[in-house]
Swiss-Prot record:
One of its GO terms (biological process) is polysaccharide catabolic process. The gene is chbG. This is Chitooligosaccharide deacetylase. Pathway: Glycan degradation; chitin degradation. It comes from Escherichia coli O1:K1 / APEC. It comes from the Bacteria. Mg(2+) binds at H61, H125. Keywords: Carbohydrate metabolism, Chitin degradation, Cytoplasm, Hydrolase, Magnesium, Metal-binding, Polysaccharide degradation. Pfam families: YdjC (PF04794). It is an enzyme of class 3 (hydrolase). Gene3D superfamilies: Glycoside hydrolase/deacetylase.
Amino acid sequence: MERLLIVNADDFGLSKGQNYGIIEACRNGIVTSTTALVNGQAIDHAVQLSRDEPSLAIGMHFVLTMGKPLTAMPGLTRDGVLGKWIWQLAEEGALPLEEITQELASQYLRFIELFGRKPTHLDSHHHVHMFPQIFPIVAKFAAEEGIALRIDRQPLSNDGDLPANLRSSQGFSSAFYGEEISETLFLQVLDDSSHRGERSLEVMCHPAFVDNTIRQSAYCFPRLTELDVLTSASLKYAIAERGYLLGSYHDV
């Protein structure tokens, strides 16, 4: 049985090292898709690199936890910037949902201005779109715009609440992450998906070359290990041997 595998590299536009790593993993590896942070410090560099890599599908990485928002968000920013305090606000039931709705629309329009086309799909930095309060907003927006959405079904209480015309992969995994990155881990993710009977799977990854920005991240040197694994010829062979076809959200 042939299955669709989407290997999506998050954080396009975060830094030049991140951008170069994603392009390398696409050009010489198995990365087929990426998602861009339109408020990232290296987003213009990402746009420039993407012009020479037309095979790379590009979605939007909705940002509510880093940098400056595109709209006024007094309910979510501190000193004009976004941060991880969004988790505390969510726990307190204090998320400014109208501000988030407006920021989503603004980031989407900015993506189109930058790349000259709609994103292939939506996901988010630090998975904030899967917050129970935020997910309905993002799901409705994606369905209305006719674009796919990354869905981690584990936190969802009921798939039946999804808009009927919303597109996504049947499976999603964030397990290819951490200090124990290897080909074995990647293939285990595929085997687990196969055992669940999923016909399509997105695997999240973060390949990068280390630069000063990446050094400041809590997740730094494993990004280099990811790059090594994702550009392995033996991994590409093993994926094909398992009956997976590399693709993107265009194919969902």
